[in-house]
Amino acid sequence: MPTDGSYFHLHLVSDSTGETLITVSRAVSAQYANVSPVEHVYPLVRSQKQLDRVLAEIEEAPGIVLFTLLEQDLVERLEKKCQDINIPSLSIIGPVMQLFQAYLGSSTTGRVGAQHTLNAEYFKRIDALNYSMMHDDGQHAEGLEEADVVLVGVSRTSKTPTSIYLANRGIRTANVPLVPGIPIPHQLESLVKPLVVSLHATPERLIQVRQNRLLSIGAAIGNEDYIDRQTVTDEVSYARRLSAKYGWALLEVTRRSIEETAAAVMKLLADRQRQRPVE
């Protein structure tokens, strides 16, 4: 057993990529700052011959063994070896599968690597995050047609945080500021694929949020127009006129949290997708 400031061997045995094991084990290991794991990752272990090598390495460097194996023969052999050399082993998905089986009253299909359909969702989120960061605040307008959602609105209507929240759900989201006197990107006038949502808040709410923002960055002096009531009211009116002109969906965000705004956008997107004819 390792002592503080030492290390221990951590064997991760998977019949697929091993990403599930790595994610779980690192989340737990992070709670033990004084002990460092030496990871031994064994992906695609699907035969007795492949397991031979794994068992030899485990015996050579004993430690904790975590596994995601669906082939019962491999599981039994691995567990027996760990018992023989007196080291702990645990199936990461086994207890969860047992819980599902007890509740659902049916057995699994035993499909190797099935959990890695989750990986597709993971990469979808990463792609969406990359897209959203590249298309924040009106940047790279030439790529707006590639978005799932385009958020527009005046300053401090939560466009960026809502974009990031949606991206974390795998929704490619761009956002474009609406500023009186500055033409909108011409691409915004003729979008076909994306849902364009115009975020609106009352002038009173915008002034409050903007004042707090200026105070937080020490820029209250010299930015009086930014929080001038008439100026802000004109901005809100301008945004509403544009929304009406181009038929953008209107979403009132005055009393909404980021999560609530994102949920409303996702509902608009789902409704739109249901209404579109299947091509």
From Swiss-Prot:
Recorded GO MF terms: ADP binding; ATP binding; phosphotransferase activity, phosphate group as acceptor; protein serine/threonine kinase activity
Domain of life: Bacteria
Record keywords, A-Z: Kinase, Nucleotide-binding, Serine/threonine-protein kinase, Transferase
Organism: Rhodopseudomonas palustris (strain BisA53)
Record-given protein name: Putative pyruvate, phosphate dikinase regulatory protein
EC number: 2.7.11.32, 2.7.4.27
Catalytic activity reported: N(tele)-phospho-L-histidyl/L-threonyl-[pyruvate, phosphate dikinase] + ADP = N(tele)-phospho-L-histidyl/O-phospho-L-threonyl-[pyruvate, phosphate dikinase] + AMP + H(+); N(tele)-phospho-L-histidyl/O-phospho-L-threonyl-[pyruvate, phosphate dikinase] + phosphate + H(+) = N(tele)-phospho-L-histidyl/L-threonyl-[pyruvate, phosphate dikinase] + diphosphate
Binding site residues for ADP: 153-160
PANTHER family, sorted: PYRUVATE, PHOSPHATE DIKINASE REGULATORY PROTEIN 1, CHLOROPLASTIC
